[in-house]
Amino acid sequence: MLAPRRKTRQLMVGSVGVGSDHPISVQSMTTTKTHDINATLQQIAQLTASGCDIVRVACPKPVDAEALPIIAKKSPIPVIADIHFQPKYIFSAIDAGCAAVRVNPGNIKEFDGRVKEVAQAAGDAGIPIRIGVNGGSLDKRILDKYHGKATPEALVESALWEASLFEEHGYGDIAISVKHSDPVLMVEAYRQLAEKCDYPLHLGVTEAGPKFMGTIKSSVAFGALLSQGIGDTIRVSLSADPVEEIKVGDQILQSLNLRPRKLEIVSCPSCGRAQVDVYKLAEEVTEGLDGLEVPLRVAVMGCVVNGPGEARDADLGVASGNGKGQIFVKGEIIKTVPESQIVQTLIEEAMRIAETMDPEVLAAAEASGMKAEVKVTS
């Protein structure tokens, strides 16, 4: 069983609530040059369609800051400006109407001395600040204290020190992240942080790597923390299309039952017993059901060993063998079809089942905006 959500203060990032009273949100970051407004808005639209709740954009140059007002206004989801090095861009982002600002206190010039101004501006605008501490860019004072190592204790101390400066100026609409590229150190840092404050926590493994490796690192780290009730918003960092970050993040939450499960395709990993090309069959079924946004479990099994049992546990499934496929609905065999008709039959039955679902269930599924994804089981 999962531990109860850790109680936190509540923030509003635009229209999205962040904190223990709200569902855990999934974020991503654009990979476009922010000053290329059309490209940035196009990517934000793609992220929104994939289920992204909040999007972050980089702001390294004056031309990027100049683009923020249009992007913040036209984006269908809340925009967070990601600020490093130059504190002036914090004020540009606030003036532009961004829903929140992420600051990295480890690399912004003389940040401590600007906290009062930032707190005043953010408070007047009514937007939150995320203090984003990163193992690769810790404040030199903290690094010196911890002998040059970005330990969990160093990450936590840096974050809470900066938060205390904001609190001294009467500003408390703060979220915190303490990211590290090592998921073990990252998990420990968040555990320590969770015990010492009530700020909402943004989870992330920084520099997680390419799609496969990054997915593994983030899944391990997020699973460990979320199962303990720690985490209020997540970003899966991948060296891949940002849409993939949303798919992974959403699936992590669904796997932990922290989001309603949507269309799930269960397929066996295949072995020498398989009497059908399971990989091809699963891919074709997934492609055919893409866009069917309902809580439906479809099993695609390659033989009669695991097939009937797995298919019976699903809403709809097939157990293949001898050039045929037995189609199951809620554990009952409804028909046997030639192998060439399996995909089309499953698609037709899935559509039929979807039409009979409770309208409220369908409405909730449609509101989630998520599409089919393959889940491979063993």
From Swiss-Prot:
The keyword RNA-binding does not apply. Gene3D superfamilies: Dihydropteroate synthase-like, Sulfite Reductase Hemoprotein, domain 1. Keywords: 4Fe-4S, Iron, Iron-sulfur, Isoprene biosynthesis, Metal-binding, Oxidoreductase. The keyword Iron-sulfur applies. Pathway: Isoprenoid biosynthesis; isopentenyl diphosphate biosynthesis via DXP pathway; isopentenyl diphosphate from 1-deoxy-D-xylulose 5-phosphate: step 5/6. Its EC number is 1.17.7.3. Pfam families: GcpE. Binds 1 [4Fe-4S] cluster. SUPFAM superfamilies: Dihydropteroate synthetase-like, Nitrite and sulphite reductase 4Fe-4S domain-like. GO terms for molecular function: 4 iron, 4 sulfur cluster binding; 4-hydroxy-3-methylbut-2-en-1-yl diphosphate synthase activity (ferredoxin); 4-hydroxy-3-methylbut-2-enyl-diphosphate synthase activity (flavodoxin); iron ion binding. It catalyses: (2E)-4-hydroxy-3-methylbut-2-enyl diphosphate + oxidized [flavodoxin] + H2O + 2 H(+) = 2-C-methyl-D-erythritol 2,4-cyclic diphosphate + reduced [flavodoxin]. Signal peptide: none annotated. [4Fe-4S] cluster binds at residues 268, 271, 303, 310. Its cofactor is [4Fe-4S] cluster. GO terms for biological process: isopentenyl diphosphate biosynthetic process, methylerythritol 4-phosphate pathway; terpenoid biosynthetic process. Belongs to the IspG family. NCBIfam families: ispG_gcpE, PRK00366.1. Converts 2C-methyl-D-erythritol 2,4-cyclodiphosphate (ME-2,4cPP) into 1-hydroxy-2-methyl-2-(E)-butenyl 4-diphosphate. This is 4-hydroxy-3-methylbut-2-en-1-yl diphosphate synthase (flavodoxin). It comes from Corynebacterium efficiens (strain DSM 44549 / YS-314 / AJ 12310 / JCM 11189 / NBRC 100395).
